[in-house]
Regions:
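Acidic, Mg2+-coordinating active-site environments of NTP-dependent enzymes
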Residues: 12, 73-78, 82, 190-334, ...
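Residue-level signal for inorganic ion chemistry
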Residues: 9, 40, 59, 101, ...
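Short, basic phosphate-binding NTP loop
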Residues: 2-115, 124-131, 135, 150, ...
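Active-site beta-alpha connecting loops in nucleotide-dependent enzymes
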Residues: 47-50, 321, 339-417
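Non-catalytic positions within long, well-ordered alpha-helices that form the structural scaffold/packing
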Residues: 56-61, 182, 355, 388
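Phosphate-binding loop of NTP-binding sites
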Residues: 8-11, 95-228, 233-243, 434, ...
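Glycine- and acidic-residue-enriched helix-capping/strand-helix junction motifs
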Residues: 473-490
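Nucleotide-activated donor-dependent transferases that construct or modify glycoconjugates
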Residues: 40, 464-473
Length: 498
């Protein structure tokens, strides 16, 4: 592990040691006293609702050896006591201090750093790339989707004996990725796509493209891997002459182009031609977006000279975070749990996948698209048109804005009697229980904040099912859907159901 000496960085962070020894190493870091471990450094962040300085004593009790604070709330006696086991450092701004120390930490590592951004699929792309890189390197990667001004420095501060870093970068406004890339200093970057996420803040997809391209500002050379199927990235690729671009795609001819694509119920298959050789690939999750994720990971792996056979295995084996096109079969019904995030660009492929399934009704449960501001009506109406275009059998919407989806689906030819619009998850779950049958396919698609897990969980809440036949009775704990399946199989001409 490459360590940072507190004394050496004090001038850079404008730090004043209030107590304790300045000659200490900054190793593990924490911003939460509930999870801090002995020997770590505590950054007492100040937020809207709380000030981490209030928990500094707790951090020291749990073994913190350094605490950064931006307001001295301690008496001389308290500082004297704290200084026996920890060093308390006063800085102008704790968050800025974390950023500056992360920059120092990054400078100590001459390793591959792959940065990923995009409107849709950043986290799943990051997971596949990290899995591919792990075939050759000891990889540190962004945990979850901790991709902001706190998450990026914390990921970098987690570097120990790693020899590669895969880091995700998100943004809500222009200028944010510019700062993140200056912290991480990528050696290679990936842009998964340019869509409409956060368009309410940025005003247009073209402005979103500019904000995502800020990722180049932290690179010595502009080597970037881009999705050539995305209209704005494709256009930029043709116009830009300043950067080295590596392209991937399914529809547009690219350096890495997927061919013979087969989207199956439980994953994808495709062929990739490299130097006149054909290689077969599979992914665990279905849909174009996971093929594009795989292609970006293949491009990264080949850039770092990872053997193609190892890349094949890694792509097939890569685990993707929960609630992103999770396929589950229960009681002979197929559920597509895709409710981590939602945008026009992520909803379209989910609907296309649902449309391609056969047998039973194809039911789409869709919620409000968040963070789109004045573009809300337009984007929800475009989703409604996609629902009708994909011949979805039943549509259930949840939320005020999602009503634009339902109304537009009807305007585009979907039967009105097959569209149900609600404001709560309970209403949606109740209707779903009522209409669902054996063999149906159900897509649950929404942003995480819509809590669509409540709809899914509501289908499998346990009930008591009593069965009486010939004077003999039995009682069973079953889910609502299992109970319904049993009742549907009973011959109603022979038996009475109560």
């Amino acid at each position: 592990m490459k360590k940072i000496n507190l004394k050496e960085v004090l001038p850079q962070i404008s730090g004043e040691v209030l107590c304790g020894d300045a000659d200490k190493e900054i190793e593990g870091v924490s911003i939460d006293t509930r999870t801090i471990e002995s020997g770590e450094t505590y950054f007492a962040l100040k937020g809207e609702n709380t000030d981490g300085t209030k928990y500094c004593k707790d951090a020291v009790k749990k073994g913190a050896i350094i605490c950064f604070i931006q307001e001295n709330i301690f008496t001389d006696e308290e500082l004297s006591e704290l200084g026996k086991s920890a060093t308390i450092v006063l800085v102008p701004n704790v968050e800025d201090t974390l950023v500056e120390i992360a920059k120092v930490k990054r400078s100590l590592y001459d390793i591959p750093v792959v940065a990923i951004t995009g409107s849709v699929g950043k986290t799943s792309t990051k997971d596949v790339i990290a899995r591919v890189m792990a075939e050759k390197y000891n990889v540190q990667k962004t945990q979850g989707n901790h991709n902001n001004r706190l998450g990026v420095p914390l990921t970098i501060m987690g570097l120990k004996d790693h020899d590669a870093l895969v880091i995700e970068m998100g943004m809500n406004h222009a200028g944010e990725i510019s700062e993140l890339t200056q912290i991480a200093r990528p050696t290679l970057s990936v842009i998964s796509n340019i869509g409409t996420s956060h368009i309410g803040n940025l005003g247009s997809r073209e402005n979103i493209l500019k904000a995502k391209l800020e990722i180049l500002e932290g690179m010595d050379k502009g080597r970037i891997i881009i999705n050539n199927d995305n209209d704005l990235l494709h256009k930029w690729n043709l116009e830009d002459t300043d950067n080295e671009k590596i392209t991937f795609g399914i529809k547009e001819k690219s350096k890495y182009t997927a061919e013979n694509v087969k989207i199956k119920e439980d994953g994808n298959e495709f062929t990739l031609k490299i130097d006149n050789q054909e290689y077969e690939f599979t992914t665990k999750k279905p849909g174009d977006i996971f093929i594009l994720n795989a292609l970006s990971a293949i491009a990264v792996g080949l850039e770092y000279d990872i053997p193609i056979e190892k890349i094949q295995n890694a792509v097939a084996d890569a685990e993707i975070a929960k609630n992103r096109m999770d396929i589950e079969k229960k009681d002979n019904v197929l559920y597509i749990k895709d409710y981590y995030n939602a945008s026009l660009e992520s909803i379209k492929p989910s609907l296309e996948y649902l449309s391609g399934l056969t047998g039973g009704k194809r039911i789409a449960v869709l919620g409000d698209i968040k963070e789109v501001g004045d573009f809300s009506q337009e984007l929800h109406e475009k989703v409604g048109a996609e629902v009708a275009k994909n011949k979805i059998d039943v549509l259930i919407t949840v939320g005020k804005e999602a009503e634009y989806i339902g109304n537009t689906a009807v305007l585009n030819g979907m039967p009105r009697e097959n569209v149900f619009m609600y404001r709560t998850n309970l209403q949606a779950s109740t209707k779903l229980k009522e209409i669902i049958s054996l063999g149906d396919k159900v897509l649950l698609k929404a942003s995480n904040s819509m809590r669509f897990g409540e709809i899914y969980d509501g289908l499998f809440r346990k009930i008591k099912l009593a069965i009486v036949v010939g004077g003999m009775s039995s009682e069973h704990d079953v889910s609502l859907m299992s109970g319904k399946s049993v009742l549907e199989k009973i011959d109603k001409d022979k038996y009475e159901i109560k």
